[in-house]
């Protein structure tokens, strides 16, 4: 029997806007990984995005509305209030100091797995966390040989390994096939197309009230 505390989940993103593809996928992935709570970690200055995100206070407000119905989810605001780019390695080092006995499970999409080798100090990430990968439609790109080797080395078939070690494993979760992206939502809003099946009603109303993602909006 190990002396580890319950595993903690972290799910980072710009959430511009947050949508069902975020919330539903991470809830299912957390259940499969055996993780009881997940911190939603909105970033202020994204490193891997090619557009400037909406104002942080809007993204944070929408995220708070979106997770009201999910008691498993809460918000960690450390990155969104930072004036420097959000590098995962820096956040994980801080979290490890705060939670030395808890396995840390960092949730990402399959698209992020494909780009993982370009992340800052990516090899060192495995010294701080496990990765739980949420499968996502439209990411059928073949894995590189380096990624294949990484999965051979670190992938685990069951979630037990995530709770018996502090870090170092990759768990592939079978998440719902929700073909939703924030960029598609922004495109639909700017073209006055419906987004009812993509966004929580309160988030949709917030966007309408504050006139976000209109033609004059920079994103």
Swiss-Prot record:
Pathway listed: Cofactor biosynthesis; NAD(+) biosynthesis; deamido-NAD(+) from nicotinate D-ribonucleotide: step 1/1
Enzyme class: transferase
Keyword Nucleotidyltransferase attached: yes
Pfam families per record: CTP_transf_like
Entry keyword annotation includes Ribosomal protein: no
Signal peptide start and end residues: none
EC number: 2.7.7.18
GO biological process, one term: NAD biosynthetic process
GO terms for MF: ATP binding; nicotinate-nucleotide adenylyltransferase activity
Alphabetically ordered keywords of this record: ATP-binding, NAD, Nucleotide-binding, Nucleotidyltransferase, Pyridine nucleotide biosynthesis, Transferase
Catalytic activity reported: nicotinate beta-D-ribonucleotide + ATP + H(+) = deamido-NAD(+) + diphosphate
Gene3D superfamilies the record matches: HUPs
Function description: Catalyzes the reversible adenylation of nicotinate mononucleotide (NaMN) to nicotinic acid adenine dinucleotide (NaAD).
Family affiliation: Belongs to the NadD family.
Protein name, per record: Probable nicotinate-nucleotide adenylyltransferase
Organism for this UniProt entry: Pseudoalteromonas atlantica (strain T6c / ATCC BAA-1087)
């Amino acid at each position: 029997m190990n002396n580890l505390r319950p595993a903690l989940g972290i799910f980072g993103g710009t959430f511009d806007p947050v949508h069902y593809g975020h919330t539903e996928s991470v809830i299912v992935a957390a259940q499969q990984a055996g993780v009881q709570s997940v911190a939603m970690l909105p970033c202020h200055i994204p490193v891997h995005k090619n557009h400037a995100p909406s104002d942080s206070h809007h993204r944070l407000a929408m995220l708070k509305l979106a997770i009201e119905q999910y008691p498993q989810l809460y918000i960690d605001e450390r990155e969104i209030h930072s004036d420097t780019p959000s590098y995962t390695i820096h956040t994980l080092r801080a979290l490890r100091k705060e939670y030395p006995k808890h396995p840390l499970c960092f949730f990402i999409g399959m698209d992020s797995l494909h780009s993982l080798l370009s992340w800052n100090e990516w090899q060192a990430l495995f010294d701080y966390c496990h990765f739980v990968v949420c499968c996502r439609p439209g990411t059928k790109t073949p894995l590189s040989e380096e990624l294949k080797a990484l999965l051979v080395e670190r992938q685990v078939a069951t979630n037990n390994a995530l709770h018996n070690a502090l870090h170092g494993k990759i768990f592939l979760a079978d998440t719902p096939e929700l073909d939703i992206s924030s960029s598609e939502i922004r495109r639909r809003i700017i073209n006055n197309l419906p987004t009812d099946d993509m966004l929580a009603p309160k988030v949709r109303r917030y966007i309408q009230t504050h006139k976000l993602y209109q033609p004059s909006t920079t994103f």
